[in-house]
Amino acid sequence: MFHITVLAVGRLKEKYLTEGAAEYLKRLSAYAKISVVEVEDGSLPENPAAAGGEKVKEKEGERLLGRLRPGTFLIALDVRGKMHSSEEMAEILNRLALSGRSDITFAIGGALGLSEKVLERAAMRLSFSRMTFPHQLVRLILLEQLYRWFKIARGEPYHY
């Protein structure tokens, strides 16, 4: 059985996000041991594009890296990552399982994204789109996609 960790900067605040995440976590429990680990997000400077923004991203990255389990297969969610279809991701998860890689961590950065150190540590960089999404919404999208990938892999109805 997979052990999947969603490692995220910040807490979900909006009710619709917390309710949606709770629903998909409940659904996913039939397919994997899944946990969500949140690390504190940094205070954004007035001008995040300035050097202060990089420092916030580095601090958040240190917090994320400090929560990684040894040997986990790290997938970084990054707008510059590679895009895959849901079917392709289901196949990637199958290949990881067949190769003995059942401990997988998905890292979601804060408002400024992931630090270079986190991106360098990642075995894979995944993008859901070339568009930018709020990092809290990305968590809900990831949980839905994880559920979809497991349904596809098992040939169960959900994905059409």
Swiss-Prot record:
Quickly give the catalysed reaction.
Answer: pseudouridine(1915) in 23S rRNA + S-adenosyl-L-methionine = N(3)-methylpseudouridine(1915) in 23S rRNA + S-adenosyl-L-homocysteine + H(+)
- What is the uppermost EC class here? transferase
Task: Check the record and name the InterPro entries matching this protein.
Answer: Alpha/beta_knot_MTases, RlmH-like, tRNA_m1G_MTases_N
Q: Which domain of life is it from?
A: Bacteria
Give the Enzyme Commission number: 2.1.1.177
Under the subunit heading, UniProt states: Homodimer.
Keyword S-adenosyl-L-methionine among record annotations: yes
List S-S links within the chain: none
Protein name (database record) = Ribosomal RNA large subunit methyltransferase H
Binding positions for S-adenosyl-L-methionine per the UniProt entry: L77, G109, F128, S129, R130, M131, T132, F133
Q: Which NCBIfam families match?
A: PRK00103.1-3, tRNA_RlmH_YbeA
One of the record's GO molecular function terms:
rRNA (pseudouridine-N3-)-methyltransferase activity
* Gene3D superfamilies listed in its UniProt record: 3.40.1280.10
* The protein's role, per its UniProt record: Specifically methylates the pseudouridine at position 1915 (m3Psi1915) in 23S rRNA.
Sorted alphabetically, which keywords does the UniProt record give? Cytoplasm, Methyltransferase, rRNA processing, S-adenosyl-L-methionine, Transferase
Q: What is its main location?
A: cytoplasm
Q: Which organism is it from?
A: Pelotomaculum thermopropionicum (strain DSM 13744 / JCM 10971 / SI)
GO cellular component entries: cytoplasm
Where's it found, cell-wise?
Answer: Cytoplasm
Similarity comment: Belongs to the RNA methyltransferase RlmH family.
